[in-house]
Amino acid sequence: MYLSKVIKQDYNDNGYAIIRSVIEPDLVEEVQKHVEWLQNKYPKIRPEAFHHDLLVDDPFIHELLNNQDMLDIIEMIIGPNIALFGAHYIAKRPKDGKPVGWHQDGSYWPLEPMNVVSVWLAGTESLKKMVVCV
C-alpha cells in the first residue's frame, strides 16, 4: 500500500512517475521480438510508425496491454476504471528515427476530469541524454 501512495504522489506532484521493472524480462524480450516481427511484416513502414491501425487486431499487443502488473500500477494512479484510447510502438533504432516533439497527451482526449496516464515501456536500455524530457 505504501508503494501505491508514493507512485500516486509522484504522479500528482510531478505530472509523471517512473516505475522500473514493471514487466518481467521475458515479456520485454517478447516485445523486442514483436517489433522485429512487425519490421519484417511491414518492411516499408518505419518502426516508429507502428501505430494503432497495425496493432488493433494483434493478439500480442492485447496480451501486453492486459499485463496485470502494468494494470495494477495504472490503477494506483487513476483508479479501477481504465480505458485504452490507443496503442503504438515508438520503436527507434540507434542514431536513426524521427524525434517526438514536445506535446501534451491530454490535449488529444478532452476528458473531464483529466484523470489520464500515458504509459511508456522501454524495450531496450536508453542513454540518459536520449530519454523522455518532462
Spans of model-derived segments:
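Non-heme Fe(II)-dependent double-stranded beta-helix
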Residues: M1-L111
